[in-house]
Amino acid sequence: MRECISIHIGQAGIQVGNACWELYCLEHGIQPNGQMPADNTTGGGDDAFNTFFSETGAGKHVPRAVYVDLEPTVCDEVRTGSYRQLYHPEQIISGKEDAANNYARGHYTIGKEIVDIVLDRIRKLSDNCTGLQGFLVFHATGGGTGSGLGSLLLERLSVDYGRKSKLSFAITPAPQVATAVVEPYNSVLSTHALLEHTDCTFCLDNEALYDVCRRNLDIERPTYTNLNRLVAQVISSLTASLRFDGALNVDVTEFQTNLVPYPRIHFMLTSYAPIISAEKAYHEQLSVAEITNSVFEPAGMMTKCDPRHGKYMACCLMYRGDVVPKDVNAAVATIKTKRTIQFVDWCPTGFKCGINYQPPTAVPGGDLARVQRAVCMVANTTAIAEALSRIDHKFDLMYAKRAFVHWYVGEGMEEGEFSEAREDLVALEKDYEEVGAETADGDGEEEEFGEEY
């Protein structure tokens, strides 16, 4: 088996996790108490969904997941929520005091006390696997726990499970919407760790998700639940081929192979289609060609950046539902002829497609319509550098005055770490610039991008 272990860190990670596991359970017909009436091989078996769920002898399906937070309230919601019977009590680990939006608290003072318990729990989960494929880490880079404890855990996972792939789903700070003043600090410090210790990072930001909810689903004031359910659909599409059998299955390691041209260039842009409310879906023909076109719409991106400002290096299309390879080839060919999507000149083809016959599942009472087919796009594009440089710029404005730095230093961090992380990101921006530059004229003037702050 190719098992995956999910690790949900901090409030964002846990709440996205809730939405994901709710969706997985619906997709596989697993009840909130872990029973699965349709499953004939009790206590194991080589069913495809066993990559994400382990089975007990009593026929109960338990997610291969760990929930971690430094304060109890969010974990308590899982412990008392409708899926409380799904998890083993030891899978939900909470501390007593908050990281208080402070990377240093999550990484040094408070995170240090909890990290060994978490690693022990992960070790128990991995002992339970026959062929562990890797880890999916869910966190936000702007807070304290997701950034600090998140990067601490990733560092320790690199040591303990060196060869296993680590994919991270990171909620990154949005341009206008912020939940904390020190977001840029936390984000730069944790991106520094993500650069080194993850194989692939999927960037999502709340503002882009808000816009998608407002525009496509006509939700005037989207709540976190709306956003998380949207994110869950994306993550479900990415992991569908691990959990179901399909025509063109895509493995976690295949993502890296096809999407990451250089180890540092691994920040991905995602989008999903059709995002459409039930009233509209009734009147629209959502053909393969149409949904394929709409995932490339700049407005539908899950991170605030404009793919037209950058070049694509690689692109992965994950179809699910009633889709045949012939339609996919036609849709991709159309996109190639349109020339709206610019690839770097050293990577001419750049599309990897996966097809999964399991149609997308709609959450009862959710916002998304039930549709026959859907597609999720993951792209490695130089446009994501816009989002990175935006955070770097905000970091610079604050750090020039050393604002708020004493909170970090007081928790045992050194000021040198700030400049080290920032220099690493300067190098990353440069890397993105060079990757997107034309190969023919290597010595031309490099133009700075990042026009909009």
Curated annotation (Swiss-Prot):
SUPFAM superfamilies: Tubulin C-terminal domain-like, Tubulin nucleotide-binding domain-like. It catalyses: GTP + H2O = GDP + phosphate + H(+). Residues 433-453 are annotated as: Disordered. The record marks Y453 as: Involved in polymerization. CDD domains: alpha_tubulin. The keyword rRNA processing does not apply. GTP binds at Q11, E71, G144, T145, T179, N206, N228. The active site is at E254. Pfam families: Tubulin, Tubulin_C. Undergoes a tyrosination/detyrosination cycle, the cyclic removal and re-addition of a C-terminal tyrosine residue by the enzymes tubulin tyrosine carboxypeptidase (TTCP) and tubulin tyrosine ligase (TTL), respectively. The keyword Nuclease does not apply. Disulfide bonds: none annotated. Keywords: Cytoplasm, Cytoskeleton, GTP-binding, Hydrolase, Magnesium, Metal-binding, Microtubule, Nucleotide-binding. Mg(2+) binds at E71. GO terms for cellular component: cytoplasm; microtubule. It is found in: Cytoplasm, Cytoskeleton. Its cofactor is Mg(2+). GO terms for molecular function: GTP binding; hydrolase activity; metal ion binding; structural constituent of cytoskeleton. Dimer of alpha and beta chains. A typical microtubule is a hollow water-filled tube with an outer diameter of 25 nm and an inner diameter of 15 nM. Alpha-beta heterodimers associate head-to-tail to form protofilaments running lengthwise along the microtubule wall with the beta-tubulin subunit facing the microtubule plus end conferring a structural polarity. Microtubules usually have 13 protofilaments but different protofilament numbers can be found in some organisms and specialized cells. Tubulin is the major constituent of microtubules, a cylinder consisting of laterally associated linear protofilaments composed of alpha- and beta-tubulin heterodimers. Microtubules grow by the addition of GTP-tubulin dimers to the microtubule end, where a stabilizing cap forms. Below the cap, tubulin dimers are in GDP-bound state, owing to GTPase activity of alpha-tubulin. Belongs to the tubulin family. This is Tubulin alpha-1 chain. The lineage of its organism: Eukaryota, Sar, Stramenopiles, Ochrophyta, PX clade. The gene is TUBA1.
